[in-house]
A protein has these predicted regions:
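Hinge/lid segment of periplasmic solute-binding proteins
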Residues: 99, 124-177, 201, 229-233, ...
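Short, solvent-exposed loop/beta-turn-alpha elements that line the ligand-binding surface or hinge
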Residues: 140-153, 210-213, 218-220, 239-260, ...
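Long, aromatic- and glycine/proline-rich binding clefts that accommodate carbohydrate-like moieties
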Residues: 156, 311, 315-318, 364-414, ...
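Extracytoplasmic/periplasmic substrate-recognition and gating elements
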Residues: 82, 86-87, 92, 188-189, ...
Length: 443
């Protein structure tokens, strides 16, 4: 049944998704589950060929980065794959979970050895890179019902898969990040929601220190220092990575505003108010749920993770704290794509199933914001209260939609680590980084 009031959700999502003209990352943890559609190990998947058959059974190899311990992976293995196999006799899905960064690198390696899977769930920022490598199938050119299938998905979400007039994937989900904060700790300290960067800094300073058990407490957590993590702070404070045409980093990545934003994070780390990205640090969900981290920027999946691991933990949310440029989060999301070595008939059947209203409603229960129009208008989405994230999408920005983004992101992460963790000079490091990024943009 559909609620008439949920039309508002679809309207908001459609409006918000107009921001999705570029790209969108999501994540959790890892440990395989055993199900009727049993997840194979990476070693086994190496031996599985893209168009493998066993008698009359065709195997569809699907690589993804739903963490193996996550609700998303449980739904994939226990609900979606069994349903697909039931509806499509003769097909078996061999699903393999990878860490987010490992999946990207695995695809690069497999492309050179011609051992790519049939289908993969891709961070939208990877699509231009893989298209440039000529390993993705142009779906609108090769699938006769592409127009019908894609019409069921938000047009602006589909734009993340469009390159030079052709479509190389189907939109699968969208997301962004908002601020989660420890409501009880904030109330006890007389603090209100951290709606500005000044609020965030003041709260981090006041709440960091040692708790009643003698344990260290930090005001702000980020699990990494990649673009996905640091860009909201840079953008909200008026900084940039490149010019608006994505051709130049000098004078943007090393501008005064970007330098000041990065220095803010470095100072917080130096003052023991910011952590989470070093080896051995408390994992994000555990640190937040046990009161060791007071604030973090995260996506809609964090709601279900906290409900499962720390159901009694009291937290609240607000938009990314606004700086001089406003509140600007980072767009996230994934597309589902077919590789040119695939068993195309089976791969396309699976892709259509994964973007169906049924599959997207099931994934919405796990914190994935659908891009299927029917799923967006469902009771599942209405009851999940995605409104704060859909609101944030309207002002969020995409990571630069360039084929060299993965290399740029690696260089950015290295520079942020050098500055924040190791105390390198901010201006000098960003000057050098801007020069490197200029060269990568020119490739």
């Amino acid at each position: 049944m559909k609620k008439q009031s949920t039309k508002k959700v679809l309207a908001l999502a459609t409006s918000a998704a107009m921001m999705l003209t570029a790209f969108t990352a999501c994540g959790s943890s890892q440990a395989p589950s055993t199900t009727p559609a049993q997840q194979t190990s990476e070693a086994q998947s190496e031996e599985a060929k893209d168009d493998s058959t066993n008698g009359d059974t065709v195997t569809i190899n699907f690589w993804h980065h739903y963490s193996a311990q996550s609700a998303e992976n449980e739904t994939l293995m226990n609900v979606l794959i069994p349903k697909f196999e039931e509806e499509n006799p003769g097909y078996k899905v061999n699903a393999v979970s990878h860490d987010w960064s490992d999946l990207h690198d695995k695809i690069l390696i497999s492309a050179s050895s011609q051992t790519l899977p049939d289908v993969a769930r891709l961070d939208i920022a990877w699509v231009p890179e893989f298209q440039k490598m000529n390993i993705l199938v142009p779906l609108d050119q090769e699938m006769s019902d592409f127009e019908e299938v894609s019409s069921e998905l938000l047009p602006s979400a589909m734009s993340t898969a469009q390159i030079k007039g052709s479509y190389y994937a189907l939109a699968l989900n969208t997301n962004t990040k908002i601020m989660f904060y420890n409501e009880e700790a904030f109330n006890d300290a007389g603090l209100s929601a951290p709606k500005t960067m000044d609020d965030m800094l003041a709260a981090a300073q006041k709440l960091s220190g040692t708790n009643a058990n003698g344990q260290q407490v930090w005001g702000l957590d980020e699990p990494a220092l990649a673009g996905w993590n640091v860009l909201p702070y840079i953008w909200s404070n008026g900084g940039e990575i490149t010019d608006e045409n994505y051709t130049k980093a000098t004078d943007y990545l090393n501008s005064e505003a970007t330098v000041n934003a990065v220095k803010m994070l470095a100072d917080m780390y130096k003052n023991s108010e910011f952590t989470g990205f070093n080896s051995g640090d408390i994992p994000m969900t555990d640190g937040f749920g046990t009161g060791r981290y007071m604030m973090l920027l995260e996506g809609p999946w964090k709601t279900s993770e906290l409900a499962g691991a720390y159901p009694d933990f009291k937290y609240a949310t607000c938009e990314v704290p606004a700086g001089s440029a406003g509140s600007i989060s980072v767009l996230g999301g994934e597309d589902i794509a077919m590789f040119n070595t695939a068993n195309k008939e089976g791969a396309w059947k699976f892709m259509k199933f994964m973007t169906s209203d049924f599959a997207e409603e099931e994934m919405a229960k796990c914190g994935q914001i659908p891009v299927n129009k029917e799923a967006l208008d469902s009771d599942v989405v209405a009851n999940a209260d995605y409104a704060p994230f859909l609101d944030a999408i309207t002002t969020a920005k995409a990571r630069p939609p360039v084929a060299s983004w993965s290399e740029i992101d690696n260089e950015l992460t290295t520079a942020m680590t050098s500055i924040i963790s190791e105390g390198a000079d901010v201006q000098e490091t960003l000057d050098a980084l801007a020069t490197k990024v200029d060269a990568l943009l020119a490739e």
